[in-house]
């Protein structure tokens, strides 16, 4: 499918934190909708902007109530919630996409977003767009993804009978849409991922909002998701690292001493598969009580692997 930029663009939002936005006119008669997005910590920081300038510009430009949940300890996700008229909410989310797809011209020292998040719901379901998917290959970087949080009953309305409604959204707005198969933790919420140009995503949001109002499922009694850590002892964060079998011994160390020290330093549990997989790799499974510890253990294992590879090359 070729993605095209919408011929009827949403009003331009703030492209940078420094831009001042004129207050938008609010239609008091228009029905209000509230939509929620799942964000990574890095995405949340970009949308907030320095001193909250970016989100404030989006708020003023579109006349919406918009905010991001507080950062919870041991959580790698935050929620964005926006309330306003259908058009205002859709256009503000188009502005969010523009912020997330803008070049990091002011973030020279920022680390790139990791390809895989330990909190699996942050990992995009859809693959990144390729240049041949855009009508203008030079604009492919403007294509973004949103993780819209929807309840199970809302999913049914959005998909429609035999997928008729979601197919129409895809065809009409030259966008890609997919619904997660699993619920967000401790909730009846799922992710509706939308990929496309900002204006195309805005038009999708408008149609989705109209559908939710028409089917009377905009406000449901289903259990909603909120980032939470519970008590430390109840948290179980897991990640796996595949290591070529020939390097496993070196990473374990004499008598398992090296891996034991790594466990102690990172405060994680690390187990190693007894048998290699079809790629002749053995999986290291890391389990801990928080994202940071597990990620640290993961990085240290990969660093040790790189060091061992270099050592062997030098001996050749």
UniProtKB/Swiss-Prot annotation:
SMART domains: KH. GO terms for molecular function: mRNA 3'-UTR AU-rich region binding. Signal peptide: none annotated. Residues 1-24 are annotated as: Disordered. It holds the Pfam family KH_1. Keywords: Chromatin regulator, Chromosome, Cytoplasm, mRNA transport, Nucleus, Repeat, RNA-binding, Telomere, Translation regulation, Transport. The keyword RNA-binding applies. It is found in: Cytoplasm; Cytoplasm, P-body; Nucleus; Chromosome, Telomere. Residues 32-96, 143-208, 236-301 form the KH domain. Residues 9-24 have a biased composition (Low complexity). GO terms for biological process: 3'-UTR-mediated mRNA stabilization; chromatin organization; intracellular mRNA localization; mRNA transport; regulation of translation; telomere maintenance via telomerase. GO terms for cellular component: chromosome, telomeric region; cytoplasm; nucleus; P-body. It comes from the Eukaryota. InterPro entries: KH_dom, KH_dom_type_1, KH_dom_type_1_sf. Belongs to the HEK2 family. RNA-binding protein involved in the correct localization of transcripts in the cell. RNA localization is a widespread mechanism for achieving localized protein synthesis. Involved in structural and functional organization of telomeric chromatin and regulates silencing at the HMR locus. Binds RNA. PANTHER family: KH DOMAIN CONTAINING RNA BINDING PROTEIN. This is Heterogeneous nuclear rnp K-like protein 2. The gene is HEK2.
